[in-house]
Amino acid sequence: MIIRSGVSILVDHPRLYWNDGCGPEIEWIRFTPKKIAKDKMWTAKEDSRYISPVVGLPGYRHTVGIARSSHFLTIPFFIINGIVFIFLLLYTNLWKRLVPDSFQIIPDSWNVFLHYATFNMPIEPNGFYHFNALQQLSYFAVVFIMAPLAMLTGLARSPAIDSRFNWYPKLFFNHQSARSFHFLIMFAYVIFIIVHVALVALTGFTKT
């Protein structure tokens, strides 16, 4: 729900920038074929794209208000879920399975990635069912890096935070770069979910 509403917010202005100028054709990426004429008046409203409600929440076009409300409504559940998850990790000592204890995990993760990328299946009986270096590094990044950054960059987009603490968005350079970072984190989450579900399906739901 939080990702789908985020997609609806994104397509209302499907361009991402690294500065607050947001001038014509200075975006670093766009999700629309439409180009902006530099010699005529233009508003972001004209740039809004339609998206299927199957993908976006609520989907359609010019629904950014509902999308933002849906996005904000899911945030408390995202935070509570994260707090409970981390508490259980600490309480059960399972955090030791997620937190790397050596930089050796980086070359080890690369080796595992090459193993996956060449479609080589792990040797049984352990196979996929015990954490390898890439899994450990991925889960650590999702829980302890991506989740906090998603919340921090999201706060940098808040007008209330900006008016009260106008120094805060500058931690991410500016408002638009915070939006870009927020999108990149969402994209990383989507990739993680797709790969995670694909590997679970590949190895068998009952075994994993």
State where each predicted segment sits.
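Membrane-embedded alpha-helical bundles that constitute the cytochrome b-like, heme-associated redox core
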Residues: 1-208
